[in-house]
Structures are given as C-alpha cells and as structure tokens.
Amino acid sequence: MTRDFDMLSALQMVQDITAEAGLIALGMFGQVEGHEKDDGTLVTEADRRVEQYIRKRILDQYPHHMVFGEEDGSGGMEQSPFLWLLDPIDGTNNFASGVPIWGISVGLFYKGKPFLGVLHMPCLDQTFWASDGEGAYCDGTRVSVRRTDTLARNDLLLISSPNIPHWDFSAQVKYRITGSTAYSMALVAAGNAVGTVCNHWYVWDVGASMVLLKEVGALVTDIHGQSLFDLENRDYRAPGPCMVAASPECHALLMQHVKTS
C-alpha cells in the first residue's frame, strides 16, 4: 500500500543516489569509449557502473520492489506494484563524445502510474525532481509548463531526430535536438520549450521525466492522442511509439502538425 511508503524519505534517497552516481560518471567523462549494442545504441563502462551502483542502493532499501534498467534488465520482485526505471546515462552518445548534455534518470511507478522521479544533470549542475501530488521542481524552484494558444516562430520544439515520419516540419518553430530524451522532457516540464516530439524511446528513458510532466499537468501521448502515462502491461524492452509531450494548450497546437498515416 502507498500509505506504508515514505515518499519524502524515498525522494531524498534518490536525490542522494543520483548525486553520488553523478560523481562516478563525471570521473569517467571524456575517458571512456562507447560500444554499439545489438539495438544500435551506444553503451560505455560508465553506463554499467552507474546502473550497478543505483540498482544496488535501491534494492538494499527496497528489496521487495522491482527494478528495471537499460543495461541489466529486471531485478528484485517482478510482481511488485512498485517499479523503478533506471537510465544510468541518458544521452550516452553525448557522454561518449564529451558533450556535457547527459543525465542520470531514476523514476518510480506505482501500479503502472508515474509516482516519483529524479533527473540529475551532473555537468550542468542541475537536478529536476517530482513526486505524486507535490509538483515538479528544478534545483528547489517549482516549475510549470508553457501554456499558450499560439506557436511563435521563436518557440523551441525539442525533437529526437531530424527525421520523424509522423511530424510535419512545416510548423513555424525553432527545432532543437538535445541528445537526451529525459532532458528534453524535463525542459518541457520547466517551460523552456513548448513541447517535444520523440520517435524513438524506451521506458527507462522517460521514467523520471514522465513524473515531472504529470505533475505540471502536461499531456504525453502517441500520435493518436492516447495517453502514454500508464506503463502497465507494456513490454519494457520494446521501443515506445512516437511521443508528443506538451501542456494541453500546446499539445493541441502540436497535434495539428502530426501525420497519422
């Protein structure tokens, strides 16, 4: 039962863990090479070490919870209603190339719903966090999503790739690619961008940022407008569908530029 779960204690623990994991990763930043996995994505020794550290710390505290990470898959009790999603380094290509836009993402879902999340960006010295019913924050300041009834030429739209089959690039906005799905979503939650469109993601990428977006009242949907907040019954190893995330107002505007066929 969630009433037996100490949210404040868990949030503090995850903030501490991600900060400590950030120091591990920073010690290897610019010193490790990436190797291509079977799915075509990169992995470094830093990814593995950071995930092992976070996984152990969480399971030491919550041995009856389930943990699912990008590198080592599932651990703990698979039937638990509590699911921790770990991305040890979101933005591995950036990390391996010496680009400082990468983060450590830890999200907790309860019965498939976003519950608690922390995204720590070590090089930027920036931390986002959110918990169920308590709002979303960046470095202690509460954040809010952009709400507007028009898209302006200088508004930032964060995309995962310059080639998104379901997106009409005639939309008059400024397109940017951060190289980190989690960070792009966090920037939307913080109001720095009007939205994000991502056509290639996995549950571990979005674990923390889904909580951020839920807490600021944003929508996260597929191209048909179906909510993606509920992870229950998902295949955690399968890539997610093309995602559109924004405030309800901006989401409606962005959906006008989505191609569903």
Where are the predicted features?
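An extended, acidic
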Residues: 145-261
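Short loop/edge segments at beta-strand edges and connector loops
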Residues: 69-71, 140, 179
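N-terminal subdomain of lithium-sensitive/metallo-dependent phosphomonoesterases centered on the IMPase/IPPase/PAP
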Residues: 1-89, 256-259
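DPxDG-like acidic metal-binding loop motif
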Residues: 78-139
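Generic detector of well-ordered alpha-helical packing
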Residues: 48, 71, 88-91, 122, ...
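Residue-level signal for inorganic ion chemistry
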Residues: 25, 47, 58, 92, ...
